[in-house]
Protein backbone atom coordinates (compact mmCIF):
# COMPACT_ATOMS: atom_id res chain seq x y z
CA UNK A 1 0.00 0.00 0.00
CA UNK A 2 1.19 3.56 -0.78
CA UNK A 3 0.04 7.10 0.02
CA UNK A 4 -0.80 7.59 -3.64
CA UNK A 5 -4.36 7.56 -4.95
CA UNK A 6 -6.00 4.97 -7.17
CA UNK A 7 -8.41 6.34 -9.78
CA UNK A 8 -11.27 3.94 -10.47
CA UNK A 9 -13.27 4.86 -13.56
CA UNK A 10 -16.75 3.37 -13.58
CA UNK A 11 -16.39 2.72 -9.86
CA UNK A 12 -20.09 3.27 -9.19
CA UNK A 13 -21.02 0.40 -11.49
CA UNK A 14 -21.47 -3.29 -10.82
CA UNK A 15 -17.91 -4.60 -11.00
CA UNK A 16 -16.15 -1.32 -10.23
CA UNK A 17 -18.06 -0.83 -6.97
CA UNK A 18 -17.00 -4.26 -5.72
CA UNK A 19 -13.38 -3.41 -6.49
CA UNK A 20 -13.70 -0.03 -4.75
CA UNK A 21 -15.11 -1.75 -1.68
CA UNK A 22 -12.21 -4.20 -1.56
CA UNK A 23 -9.67 -1.42 -2.13
CA UNK A 24 -11.17 0.55 0.74
CA UNK A 25 -11.09 -2.47 3.00
CA UNK A 26 -7.40 -2.87 2.12
CA UNK A 27 -6.73 0.72 3.23
CA UNK A 28 -6.09 2.17 -0.23
CA UNK A 29 -6.79 5.80 -1.16
CA UNK A 30 -9.48 5.80 -3.85
CA UNK A 31 -11.18 8.37 -6.06
CA UNK A 32 -14.03 7.24 -8.31
CA UNK A 33 -14.90 8.82 -11.66
CA UNK A 34 -18.35 7.83 -12.91
CA UNK A 35 -21.02 9.63 -14.93
CA UNK A 36 -23.75 7.61 -13.16
CA UNK A 37 -25.33 6.64 -16.49
CA UNK A 38 -25.46 3.04 -15.27
CA UNK A 39 -23.80 3.39 -11.87
CA UNK A 40 -25.18 4.45 -8.50
CA UNK A 41 -23.89 7.04 -6.08
CA UNK A 42 -24.65 4.87 -3.05
CA UNK A 43 -22.66 1.96 -4.50
CA UNK A 44 -19.43 3.86 -3.83
CA UNK A 45 -18.63 2.67 -0.32
CA UNK A 46 -15.11 4.13 -0.08
CA UNK A 47 -13.32 7.20 -1.39
CA UNK A 48 -14.66 10.27 -3.12
CA UNK A 49 -17.01 10.16 -6.10
CA UNK A 50 -16.39 12.64 -8.90
CA UNK A 51 -19.30 12.73 -11.33
CA UNK A 52 -17.96 12.96 -14.85
CA UNK A 53 -17.19 11.11 -18.06
CA UNK A 54 -13.94 9.33 -18.82
CA UNK A 55 -13.79 10.99 -22.22
CA UNK A 56 -14.13 14.53 -20.81
CA UNK A 57 -10.66 16.05 -21.15
CA UNK A 58 -11.43 19.05 -18.94
CA UNK A 59 -12.79 16.84 -16.17
CA UNK A 60 -9.74 14.57 -16.36
CA UNK A 61 -7.30 17.49 -16.27
CA UNK A 62 -8.89 18.80 -13.06
CA UNK A 63 -9.00 15.33 -11.54
CA UNK A 64 -5.33 14.53 -12.17
CA UNK A 65 -4.33 18.01 -10.93
CA UNK A 66 -6.27 17.58 -7.69
CA UNK A 67 -5.26 14.01 -6.77
CA UNK A 68 -1.82 12.39 -6.67
CA UNK A 69 -2.77 9.40 -8.83
CA UNK A 70 -0.28 6.66 -9.63
CA UNK A 71 -2.71 3.88 -10.62
CA UNK A 72 -5.79 3.81 -12.83
CA UNK A 73 -8.31 0.98 -12.70
CA UNK A 74 -10.40 1.48 -15.81
CA UNK A 75 -13.92 0.00 -15.80
CA UNK A 76 -15.98 2.76 -17.43
CA UNK A 77 -17.56 1.37 -20.61
CA UNK A 78 -20.73 0.37 -22.37
CA UNK A 79 -21.06 -3.42 -22.09
CA UNK A 80 -24.23 -4.67 -23.82
CA UNK A 81 -23.29 -6.93 -26.73
CA UNK A 82 -26.54 -6.69 -28.78
CA UNK A 83 -26.51 -2.90 -28.43
CA UNK A 84 -22.93 -2.83 -29.68
CA UNK A 85 -24.01 -4.71 -32.80
CA UNK A 86 -26.86 -2.27 -33.44
CA UNK A 87 -24.91 0.88 -32.54
CA UNK A 88 -21.18 0.25 -32.97
CA UNK A 89 -20.10 3.90 -33.03
CA UNK A 90 -21.51 4.38 -29.54
CA UNK A 91 -19.11 1.68 -28.35
CA UNK A 92 -16.09 2.90 -30.26
CA UNK A 93 -16.73 6.40 -28.94
CA UNK A 94 -17.38 5.61 -25.29
CA UNK A 95 -15.09 2.60 -24.91
CA UNK A 96 -12.17 3.19 -27.26
CA UNK A 97 -11.96 6.94 -27.83
CA UNK A 98 -12.65 7.77 -24.19
CA UNK A 99 -9.91 5.33 -23.17
CA UNK A 100 -7.48 7.18 -25.45
CA UNK A 101 -8.33 10.46 -23.71
CA UNK A 102 -7.89 8.83 -20.31
CA UNK A 103 -4.50 7.40 -21.28
CA UNK A 104 -3.28 10.77 -22.55
CA UNK A 105 -4.03 12.42 -19.22
CA UNK A 106 -2.70 9.48 -17.22
CA UNK A 107 0.64 9.70 -19.04
CA UNK A 108 0.87 13.45 -18.47
CA UNK A 109 0.24 12.87 -14.76
CA UNK A 110 2.95 10.21 -14.50
CA UNK A 111 0.62 7.29 -13.81
CA UNK A 112 2.67 4.13 -13.41
CA UNK A 113 0.07 1.36 -13.39
CA UNK A 114 -3.15 0.60 -15.24
CA UNK A 115 -5.49 -2.30 -14.56
CA UNK A 116 -7.89 -2.55 -17.48
CA UNK A 117 -11.32 -4.15 -17.57
CA UNK A 118 -11.28 -6.13 -20.81
CA UNK A 119 -13.47 -9.00 -21.94
CA UNK A 120 -13.48 -12.53 -23.28
CA UNK A 121 -15.50 -11.11 -26.18
CA UNK A 122 -12.15 -10.29 -27.81
CA UNK A 123 -11.85 -14.00 -28.70
CA UNK A 124 -15.01 -14.17 -30.78
CA UNK A 125 -15.74 -17.85 -31.43
CA UNK A 126 -12.72 -19.99 -30.44
CA UNK A 127 -12.42 -23.20 -32.43
CA UNK A 128 -13.04 -25.51 -29.47
CA UNK A 129 -15.03 -23.06 -27.32
CA UNK A 130 -12.12 -22.56 -24.92
CA UNK A 131 -9.80 -19.58 -24.90
CA UNK A 132 -6.33 -19.12 -23.47
CA UNK A 133 -4.49 -15.82 -23.60
CA UNK A 134 -2.72 -17.15 -26.71
CA UNK A 135 -5.97 -17.86 -28.57
CA UNK A 136 -6.18 -15.56 -31.61
CA UNK A 137 -8.39 -12.53 -31.04
CA UNK A 138 -11.28 -12.27 -33.49
CA UNK A 139 -14.20 -10.38 -31.90
CA UNK A 140 -17.61 -10.75 -33.54
CA UNK A 141 -19.22 -7.65 -32.03
CA UNK A 142 -18.28 -4.01 -31.54
CA UNK A 143 -18.13 -4.43 -27.77
CA UNK A 144 -15.31 -6.96 -28.08
CA UNK A 145 -13.58 -4.93 -30.78
CA UNK A 146 -13.75 -1.71 -28.76
CA UNK A 147 -12.10 -3.43 -25.80
CA UNK A 148 -9.45 -5.07 -27.97
CA UNK A 149 -8.56 -1.70 -29.49
CA UNK A 150 -7.99 -0.37 -25.98
CA UNK A 151 -5.73 -3.34 -25.22
CA UNK A 152 -3.72 -2.44 -28.31
CA UNK A 153 -3.43 1.16 -27.15
CA UNK A 154 -2.17 0.03 -23.76
CA UNK A 155 0.36 -2.31 -25.37
CA UNK A 156 1.75 0.37 -27.66
CA UNK A 157 1.77 3.12 -25.02
CA UNK A 158 3.49 0.90 -22.45
CA UNK A 159 6.17 -0.03 -24.99
CA UNK A 160 7.48 3.56 -25.11
CA UNK A 161 6.51 4.97 -21.70
CA UNK A 162 7.25 4.13 -18.04
CA UNK A 163 3.79 2.64 -17.61
CA UNK A 164 2.88 -0.99 -17.00
CA UNK A 165 -0.54 -2.57 -17.18
CA UNK A 166 -2.58 -5.69 -16.59
CA UNK A 167 -5.54 -6.25 -18.92
CA UNK A 168 -8.05 -8.66 -17.38
CA UNK A 169 -10.30 -10.45 -19.86
CA UNK A 170 -13.51 -11.18 -17.98
CA UNK A 171 -15.69 -14.13 -18.75
CA UNK A 172 -19.31 -14.02 -17.46
CA UNK A 173 -19.50 -12.07 -14.23
CA UNK A 174 -22.30 -12.83 -11.77
CA UNK A 175 -23.12 -12.83 -8.07
CA UNK A 176 -22.99 -9.98 -5.59
CA UNK A 177 -21.33 -8.86 -2.37
CA UNK A 178 -22.02 -11.61 0.20
CA UNK A 179 -22.52 -8.85 2.77
CA UNK A 180 -25.51 -7.55 0.83
CA UNK A 181 -24.17 -4.01 0.49
CA UNK A 182 -23.86 -3.77 -3.30
CA UNK A 183 -24.79 -5.78 -6.37
CA UNK A 184 -25.91 -5.58 -10.00
CA UNK A 185 -28.55 -2.86 -9.87
CA UNK A 186 -28.77 -1.57 -13.45
CA UNK A 187 -32.35 -1.47 -14.76
CA UNK A 188 -32.96 -3.57 -17.87
CA UNK A 189 -29.71 -5.47 -17.35
CA UNK A 190 -28.97 -8.30 -19.78
CA UNK A 191 -26.79 -10.52 -17.56
CA UNK A 192 -28.51 -13.91 -17.53
CA UNK A 193 -28.12 -14.59 -13.81
CA UNK A 194 -29.61 -11.23 -12.89
CA UNK A 195 -32.48 -11.57 -15.36
CA UNK A 196 -33.37 -15.03 -14.07
CA UNK A 197 -33.30 -13.84 -10.46
CA UNK A 198 -35.53 -10.90 -11.39
CA UNK A 199 -38.05 -13.43 -12.66
CA UNK A 200 -37.87 -15.24 -9.32
CA UNK A 201 -38.70 -12.09 -7.35
CA UNK A 202 -41.39 -10.96 -9.80
CA UNK A 203 -39.77 -7.85 -11.25
CA UNK A 204 -39.52 -9.42 -14.71
CA UNK A 205 -42.14 -11.69 -16.32
CA UNK A 206 -39.83 -14.27 -17.92
CA UNK A 207 -36.26 -15.04 -18.90
CA UNK A 208 -35.40 -15.52 -22.57
CA UNK A 209 -33.27 -18.41 -23.77
CA UNK A 210 -31.61 -16.97 -26.87
CA UNK A 211 -30.85 -19.91 -29.11
CA UNK A 212 -31.65 -23.57 -28.52
CA UNK A 213 -29.87 -24.98 -31.59
CA UNK A 214 -26.23 -24.31 -30.74
CA UNK A 215 -23.71 -27.16 -31.17
CA UNK A 216 -23.64 -27.75 -27.40
CA UNK A 217 -24.89 -30.71 -25.31
CA UNK A 218 -28.34 -29.18 -24.66
CA UNK A 219 -28.44 -26.72 -27.57
CA UNK A 220 -28.01 -23.59 -25.45
CA UNK A 221 -24.99 -21.35 -25.08
CA UNK A 222 -22.24 -22.34 -22.64
CA UNK A 223 -20.42 -19.77 -20.52
CA UNK A 224 -17.83 -19.58 -17.76
CA UNK A 225 -19.45 -17.78 -14.80
CA UNK A 226 -17.15 -16.01 -12.33
CA UNK A 227 -18.27 -14.53 -9.02
CA UNK A 228 -17.81 -10.77 -8.87
CA UNK A 229 -16.02 -11.09 -5.52
CA UNK A 230 -13.32 -13.27 -7.06
CA UNK A 231 -13.08 -10.94 -10.04
CA UNK A 232 -12.64 -7.94 -7.73
CA UNK A 233 -9.92 -9.80 -5.86
CA UNK A 234 -8.14 -10.42 -9.17
CA UNK A 235 -7.87 -6.64 -9.62
CA UNK A 236 -6.24 -6.22 -6.23
CA UNK A 237 -3.89 -9.08 -7.05
CA UNK A 238 -3.08 -7.39 -10.37
CA UNK A 239 -2.26 -4.15 -8.55
CA UNK A 240 0.03 -5.98 -6.13
CA UNK A 241 1.73 -7.67 -9.09
CA UNK A 242 2.42 -4.34 -10.78
CA UNK A 243 3.71 -2.82 -7.55
CA UNK A 244 6.17 -5.71 -7.28
CA UNK A 245 7.53 -4.73 -10.67
CA UNK A 246 5.58 -7.22 -12.77
CA UNK A 247 5.69 -6.78 -16.52
CA UNK A 248 2.67 -5.73 -18.55
CA UNK A 249 0.44 -8.69 -19.28
CA UNK A 250 -3.00 -9.83 -20.34
CA UNK A 251 -4.86 -12.47 -18.31
CA UNK A 252 -8.12 -14.39 -18.50
CA UNK A 253 -10.52 -14.07 -15.56
CA UNK A 254 -12.65 -17.18 -15.37
CA UNK A 255 -12.85 -20.48 -13.55
CA UNK A 256 -12.28 -22.75 -16.55
CA UNK A 257 -15.65 -24.47 -16.25
CA UNK A 258 -18.68 -23.91 -18.47
CA UNK A 259 -22.40 -24.09 -17.76
CA UNK A 260 -25.15 -23.96 -20.35
CA UNK A 261 -28.05 -21.53 -20.16
CA UNK A 262 -30.35 -24.39 -19.21
CA UNK A 263 -27.95 -25.55 -16.48
CA UNK A 264 -27.76 -22.07 -15.01
CA UNK A 265 -31.54 -21.66 -15.06
CA UNK A 266 -31.93 -25.06 -13.41
CA UNK A 267 -29.66 -23.86 -10.60
CA UNK A 268 -31.71 -20.67 -10.23
CA UNK A 269 -34.86 -22.79 -9.92
CA UNK A 270 -33.14 -25.07 -7.41
CA UNK A 271 -32.03 -22.16 -5.22
CA UNK A 272 -35.41 -20.45 -5.54
CA UNK A 273 -37.28 -23.65 -4.78
CA UNK A 274 -39.70 -23.34 -7.70
CA UNK A 275 -39.79 -23.16 -11.52
CA UNK A 276 -39.51 -19.82 -13.33
CA UNK A 277 -41.07 -18.61 -16.56
CA UNK A 278 -38.82 -19.18 -19.55
CA UNK A 279 -39.23 -18.30 -23.21
CA UNK A 280 -37.21 -19.81 -26.06
CA UNK A 281 -36.12 -17.23 -28.63
CA UNK A 282 -33.89 -17.12 -31.74
CA UNK A 283 -30.16 -16.72 -31.37
CA UNK A 284 -28.98 -13.24 -30.41
CA UNK A 285 -26.56 -11.40 -32.69
CA UNK A 286 -22.97 -11.47 -31.51
CA UNK A 287 -23.25 -14.48 -29.17
CA UNK A 288 -20.74 -17.35 -29.56
CA UNK A 289 -22.00 -20.89 -28.84
CA UNK A 290 -19.39 -21.65 -26.16
CA UNK A 291 -16.86 -19.46 -24.38
CA UNK A 292 -14.88 -20.91 -21.47
CA UNK A 293 -11.59 -19.72 -20.00
CA UNK A 294 -8.31 -21.50 -19.85
CA UNK A 295 -7.27 -19.76 -16.68
CA UNK A 296 -4.02 -21.27 -15.43
CA UNK A 297 -1.96 -18.20 -16.27
CA UNK A 298 -3.70 -15.77 -13.90
CA UNK A 299 -3.23 -18.14 -10.98
CA UNK A 300 0.47 -18.53 -11.71
CA UNK A 301 1.15 -14.85 -12.44
CA UNK A 302 -0.88 -13.23 -9.67
CA UNK A 303 -1.22 -15.98 -7.08
CA UNK A 304 -4.99 -15.62 -7.51
CA UNK A 305 -6.99 -18.27 -5.67
CA UNK A 306 -10.78 -18.03 -6.20
CA UNK A 307 -12.88 -18.33 -3.05
CA UNK A 308 -16.36 -18.36 -4.62
CA UNK A 309 -16.06 -20.92 -7.43
CA UNK A 310 -19.50 -22.42 -6.82
CA UNK A 311 -22.49 -21.94 -9.11
CA UNK A 312 -24.94 -22.30 -6.21
CA UNK A 313 -23.12 -19.54 -4.31
CA UNK A 314 -23.13 -17.30 -7.36
CA UNK A 315 -26.87 -17.76 -7.82
CA UNK A 316 -27.63 -17.46 -4.10
CA UNK A 317 -25.89 -14.10 -3.72
CA UNK A 318 -27.52 -12.87 -6.93
CA UNK A 319 -30.97 -13.87 -5.70
CA UNK A 320 -30.42 -12.34 -2.26
CA UNK A 321 -29.53 -9.06 -3.94
CA UNK A 322 -32.58 -9.11 -6.21
CA UNK A 323 -34.82 -9.73 -3.20
CA UNK A 324 -33.28 -6.70 -1.53
CA UNK A 325 -33.89 -4.57 -4.61
CA UNK A 326 -37.46 -5.83 -4.98
CA UNK A 327 -38.20 -4.98 -1.34
CA UNK A 328 -37.00 -1.42 -1.89
CA UNK A 329 -34.13 -1.69 0.58
CA UNK A 330 -31.59 -0.16 -1.80
CA UNK A 331 -32.62 3.03 -3.54
CA UNK A 332 -30.90 5.38 -5.95
Predicted segment positions?
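Active-site/binding-pocket entry motifs
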Residues: 56, 174-176, 206, 215-216
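N-terminal Rossmann-like NAD(P)+-binding domain of SDR-like oxidoreductases, especially those catalyzing
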Residues: 1-173
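A short acidic, helix-capping loop that chelates divalent metal ions and anchors anionic groups
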Residues: 81-84, 176-182, 217-219
Amino acid sequence: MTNKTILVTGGAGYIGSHVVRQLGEAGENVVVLDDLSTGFRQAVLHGELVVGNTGDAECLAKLFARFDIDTVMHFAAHTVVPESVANPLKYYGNNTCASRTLLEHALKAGVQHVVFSSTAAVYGIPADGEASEDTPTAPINAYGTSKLMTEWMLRDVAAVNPLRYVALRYFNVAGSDPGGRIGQSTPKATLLTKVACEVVVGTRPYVSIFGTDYPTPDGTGVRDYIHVEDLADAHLKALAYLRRGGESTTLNCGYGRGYSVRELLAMVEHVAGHPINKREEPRRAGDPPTLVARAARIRAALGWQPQHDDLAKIVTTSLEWERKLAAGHWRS
